[in-house]
Curated annotation (Swiss-Prot):
GO terms for cellular component: cytoplasm; cytosol; nucleus; plasma membrane. Coiled coil: none annotated. It comes from Saccharomyces cerevisiae (strain ATCC 204508 / S288c) (Baker's yeast). This is Heat shock protein SSA3. Its main location: cytoplasm.
């Protein structure tokens, strides 16, 4: 059976959770970590995802991709993409006006869209869940920042499809966190909760009213480009400048040194959340020069002061939009790793006149937790905890069409509860106008040129008539994912046309997605083949070394004779030497080599064990003989199942 999970697809870290038996389980990955770095690395031999990718970032900076969430659903000429591309050690290039990353993989130059990179992270989370649950996982609720626009949401949904998942729903991160906060507070009367969600790359503030299991979002605001990464950037720039001042060496173009500096900066930032000073020590950072310095919390706060202060603007905005005074907020819930920064906590507390934030939920796991609850609801879970739970979310940005003079005419104002449907009647601007161009925008500005164009379509075949006579009904329909459908109907002729906003500028076509799905399968198969190759290599290595250890046992030579012992020692050593020189050999080569070695070893080992009436005295110490006894087949060696034993007549 397939089980549904909740996935928090984060800028820097991702998290997966599952709801069953009235509780949410955050699922740890194969390293035992409850969050997984949103990193993908490409090498000459393999693709790495998660911890393994992040751990080798310093030695492979150009081919280690991170922060895909900062590129997803955006255009290449977006100023924020341009700024980010300067910081990234990997190459970001333009393809059809969209950003794609360029890396070297298995000796070839490859390009990947942000959707593909995100899909690789999602497939890692899917695999983590499957390993834990022991069953296939196809359905998922995936979270996005509340302030993500239509194309960013659509692109995230596409990433899920490429990863081979059915995305049940895209939900907003602060709303998911609110579920985590409110799930056990069913008996409490209506209260207003402000979710302050500052993560690795994005920032959201949502104000909700929670009453008996009904979670109603009143207003939302944020910045899809503000988070811990920006604080790290400030620290890296500061440390690089200090290194230059001390050594007269500029490391700004050395990606490996910058990566090591970034790792140290991130570690220092975390340390400063619990202590007022920390030291940074990096041996041989650049041209053999060490870098030792110390950093105080006050200095860090000064470096990021403007960024920290800017987090209060969205707080003021949601209060204004929901027409509430700060004194009417009952709980402030901090979500996202960056809310551990003491200065952020103090700013929020001071803004609310000294009110202490609620610390009842884990800031790293709350979003995945809420997503898992929503996944359970959408797949019909009958738990009493989720039965009366109702989520009423909102559209983060106003939606409308362009009317004469480039004016933005809003059909759905921001913070409208979704799903929602709204129609308005328009007419022609000129006499005998044969058609109209419906251009759909999102944003708050009066003129459309200052807003974001989502898509456009033609409604043609309007019969000749004076201006203002034809009646054209335009309908906006937002689904529960926050994704928009627009239709137009000319009343006189009944002619209609519609568009699901697929944002041709930022969205993948169906063919692209299908191609990426099949490529993802190919990469997955490559990964499995590589894992099999490494296993065959390790098996042979383990076998050869165990043979070598057995030869050194005191009784070995007297039981098998000098010649056989010498022959086995030579064969084992030759295999070990061959392995050292053949790190990139194929699976079959390793298996053939194992068979060869077994051909020499098995008769000798049979003699050794036979002479000792069962297991020789050294068998226990060396863990037993790990290879194959005669007729046990080549694959028996080195498996975790232990020695292969067969009955002797």
């Amino acid at each position: 059976m397939s089980r549904a999970v909740g996935i928090d697809l984060g800028t820097t870290y991702s998290c997966v959770a599952h709801f069953s038996n009235d509780r949410v389980e955050i699922i740890a990955n194969d390293q035992g970590n409850r969050t997984t770095p949103s990193y993908v690395a490409f090498t000459d031999t393999e693709r790495l995802i998660g911890d393994a990718a992040k751990n080798q970032a310093a030695i492979n900076p150009h081919n280690t991709v991170f922060d895909a969430k900062r590129l997803i659903g955006r255009k290449f000429d977006d100023p924020e993409v341009t700024t980010d591309a300067k910081h990234f050690p990997f190459k970001v290039i333009s393809r059809d006006g969209k950003p794609v990353v360029q890396v070297e993989y298995k000796g070839e130059t490859k390009t990947f869209t942000p959707e593909e990179i995100s899909s690789m992270v999602l497939s890692k989370m899917k695999e983590t869940a499957e390993n834990y649950l022991g069953t296939t996982v196809n359905d998922a609720v995936v979270t996005v920042p509340a302030y993500f626009n239509d194309s960013q949401r659509q692109a995230t949904k596409d990433a899920g499809t490429i990863a081979g998942m059915n995305v049940l729903r895209i939900i907003n991160e602060p709303t998911a966190a609110a579920i985590a906060y409110g799930l056990d507070k069913k008996g409490r009367a209506e209260h207003n909760v402000l979710i302050f969600d500052l993560g690795g790359g994005t920032f959201d503030v949502s104000l909700l009213s929670i009453d008996e299991g009904v979670f109603e979002v009143k207003a939302t605001a944020g910045d899809t480009h503000l988070g811990g990464e920006d604080f790290d950037n400030r620290l890296v720039n500061h440390l690089a400048t200090e290194f230059k001042r001390k050594t007269k060496k500029d490391i700004s173009n050395n990606q490996r040194s910058l990566r090591r500096l970034r790792t140290a900066a991130e570690r220092a930032k975390r340390a400063l959340s619990s202590s007022s000073q920390t030291s940074i020590e990096i041996d041989s950072l650049f041209e053999g020069m060490d870098f030792y310095t110390s950093l105080t919390r006050a200095r860090f706060e000064e470096l990021c002061a403007d960024l920290f202060r800017s987090t209060l603007e969205p707080v003021e905005k949601v209060l204004k939009d929901s027409k509430l005074d700060k004194s009417q907020i009952d709980e402030i819930v901090l979500v996202g790793g960056s809310t551990r920064i003491p200065k952020i906590q103090k700013l929020v507390s001071d803004f609310f006149n000294g009110k202490e934030p609620n610390r009842s939920i884990n800031p790293d796991e709350a979003v995945a937790y809420g997503a898992a609850v929503q996944a359970a609801i959408l797949t019909g879970d009958q738990s009493t905890k989720t039965q009366d739970l109702l989520l009423l979310d909102v559209a983060p940005l106003s939606l409308g069409i362009e009317t004469a003079g480039g004016i933005m005419t809003k059909l759905i104002p921001r913070n409208s509860t979704i799903p929602t449907k709204k129609s308005e009647t328009f007419s022609t601007y000129a006499d005998n106008q044969p058609g109209v161009l419906i251009q759909v925008f999102e944003g708050e500005r009066t003129r459309t040129k200052d807003n974001n164009l989502l898509g456009k379509f033609e409604l043609s075949g309007i019969p000749p008539a004076p201006r203002g006579v034809p009646q054209i009904d335009v309908t906006f329909d937002i689904d529960a994912n926050g994704i928009l459908n627009v239709s137009a109907l000319e009343k006189g002729t009944g002619k209609s046309n519609k568009i699901t906003i697929t944002n041709d500028k930022g969205r993948l076509s169906k063919d692209d997605i299908d191609r990426m799905v099949s490529e993802a399968e190919k990469y997955r198969a490559d990964d499995e083949r590589e894992a099999e190759r490494v296993q065959a290599k390790n098996q042979l290595e383990s076998y050869a070394f165990t043979l070598k250890n057995t030869i050194n046992e005191a009784s070995f030579k007297e039981k098998v004779g000098e010649d056989d012992a010498k022959r086995l020692e030579t064969a084992s050593q030759e295999t070990i030497d061959w392995l050292d020189a053949s790190q990139a050999a194929s699976t079959d080569e390793y298996k053939d080599r194992q068979k060869e070695l077994e051909g020499i070893a098995n008769p000798i080992m049979t003699k050794f064990y036979g002479a000792g009436a069962g297991a020789g005295p050294g068998a226990g110490e060396s863990g037993g003989f790990p290879g194959s006894m005669p007729n046990s087949g080549a694959t028996g060696g080195g498996e975790d199942t232990g020695p292969t034993v067969e009955e002797v007549d």
